[in-house]
Amino acid sequence: VALAVGVGVGWHQWQQQPTFTSSHLTPRGQARTITLPDGTALSLDADTQAQVTLYRDRREVRITQGQILFAVAPDSARPFHVLVGPARVTVGGTRFSVRYRATGMEAGSAKVAVQEGHVRVAGAQGTAAADAAPAALVAGQALSVSPAGVLGPVSAVAPGSIALWRKGLIRFENTPLADAWWNWSATGRPAW
């Protein structure tokens, strides 16, 4: 019995050891795309910070600032999780964007938008809404998550309008000027 318990504990410890880790930072005015060992592509917008950890049984990206467009390689044995402020996004293989600002007008909130496939969004552990039911999003849908982890309503979004920054574009609609200016300044481009 002791041997079986020891093997079980050892197996669990082995599963929890990362097989790959990396940290990424893109300064204002720059963007870049990285490809992970599993084939997943991460397109990081300007002023973005993220940590990547791949395990034997799961894949995780923690965004501490900024915006990333994910093109996740399918792997049913290793789900892909994005941990971002008040939210946790879980996918199998899809294309979606996650935005999080630690400071500024939208401080502490997250926005998830799906270009292809589907994702599940839930409040992060430790938030007031961690036990609430997750939301399932499909292509052409988006939602925001409050700093307390409360999921906002699902809204329609044109898949082609997701991650416009990759095309050198930025779009504002019904956005207060202060919010627009703060978001524009992160691009590092002159406003004239």
Annotate each language-model stretch with its function.
Residues 1-19:
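Single-pass transmembrane signal-anchor helices and their membrane-water interface zones
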Residues 2, 117, 156-157:
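Secondary-structure transition/turn motif
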Residues 4, 20-23, 40, 67, ...:
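Short hydrophobic/aromatic-rich motifs at helix boundaries and adjacent loops
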Residues 7-8, 24-26, 92, 154-160:
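Short amphipathic alpha-helical segments, especially helix-boundary/capping motifs
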Residues 20-147:
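Short, small/hydrophobic-biased targeting/export segments
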Residues 22-23, 98-102, 161-179:
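Short acidic/polar beta-strand-loop edge motifs in secreted extracellular
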Residues 39, 171-192:
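Amphipathic, non-transmembrane alpha-helical segments in extracytoplasmic/periplasmic proteins
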Residues 145-165:
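A short, charged helix-loop
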